[in-house]
Amino acid sequence: VALINNQFLPYPYYAKPGAVRSPAQILQWQVLPNTVPAKSCQAQPTTLARHPHPRLSFMAIPPKKNQDKTDIPTINTIATVESTITPTTEAIVDTVATPEASSEVIESAPETNTDQVTSTVV
């Protein structure tokens, strides 16, 4: 702890070395008031020039690592539009060409098998 005795400060202020403080707290120590302190400070000339510690809600606290904990699946919270399921009928055409070695000219169409398939589209 170093005593800061400056001609611009009306009372001596104590400052802790910055090596043991976090960067956020170092900035708090570097800004010292150079105006006349409030009446509560005038009654106690050895008051430390420090700001109160930030509340815990402002501090970053890492989560506890629990190895027994199972993974929680992520849930998509984006609202999806529910659509009505409508059955559709699609015709699947299976074209089979029979490669027969023939000298005859075949003028008919190739064999086709048509199957009816019913699927649901979402």
Curated annotation (Swiss-Prot):
Modified residues (Phosphothreonine): T98
Any one of the GO CC terms: extracellular space
Pfam entry (one): Casein_kappa
Glycosylation sites: T74, T84, T86, T89, T95, S102, T118
Record's keyword terms, sorted: Glycoprotein, Milk protein, Phosphoprotein, Secreted
Record keyword Phosphoprotein present: yes
GO terms under biological process: lactation; protein stabilization
Biased composition (Polar residues): 110-122
Site (Cleavage): F58, M59
Modified residues (Phosphoserine): S102, S119
UniProt cross-references to InterPro entries, sorted A to Z: Casein_kappa
Tissue: Mammary gland specific. Secreted in milk.
KW Glycoprotein (keyword) present: yes
UniProt-annotated location(s): Secreted
Residue span of region Disordered: 99-122
Family: Belongs to the kappa-casein family.
Function recorded in the entry: Kappa-casein stabilizes micelle formation, preventing casein precipitation in milk.
Protein name as catalogued: Kappa-casein
Organism: Odocoileus hemionus (Mule deer)
